[in-house]
Amino acid sequence: QGFMVRKSLGVSSALELDGASVCVNTGTTTELNLADFFRANGMSYEPVVFEKADEVVAAYDAGRCDVHTTDKSGLAAQRTKTAQPDDHMVLPETISKEPLGPVTREGDEPWSDIVFWVLNALITADELGVSSSSVDSVKNDADATPEWKRILGVEGDTGAHLGLGKEWAYNAIKQVGNYGEMYERHVGMNTPLELARDGSL
């Protein structure tokens, strides 16, 4: 969770928001995190609360509050929908971490398992520096770890229990890249959302 402000407010840090009016959804953890952040930093604020998320966005865009707070990914998306996106910025501070990820339909366990394991393979590849451009060399490296040989389908058949071929993880990494590559391509700093990875995955 973070904060979005108009650049004209003249602040570059959430620690400069003492006395600000903040648009927020009522009855949410977002509202609780907001109160905790201001209290922990010895600052005051004026909550401007709404039941629905679109009401919060509309009120912020209409100038009814100085600040909008919600998940940073939501702020980035909502910034692109304002009348003048370049007039707004998401402040650098992350005041709470909200886990966001893929969801699947209840009752389709095979598909849920595939989504879970593919996501884990892409995150592992990112953590270990295996990208869409380097996955072939890792796969063909005789000195690759046994773990990578299994993941990439060189040894064993880890895809069988998922109903997939043995190169399922290799194919995913080769086709879409690791988690970091996907992140940068869809929501990273060179996209309209401009979400920095620092402090997230």
Where do the protein language model's features map onto the residues?
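C-terminal functional modules
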Residues: 154-201
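Extended ligand-binding regions for polar small-molecule ligands
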Residues: 5-11, 15, 20-21, 26-29, ...
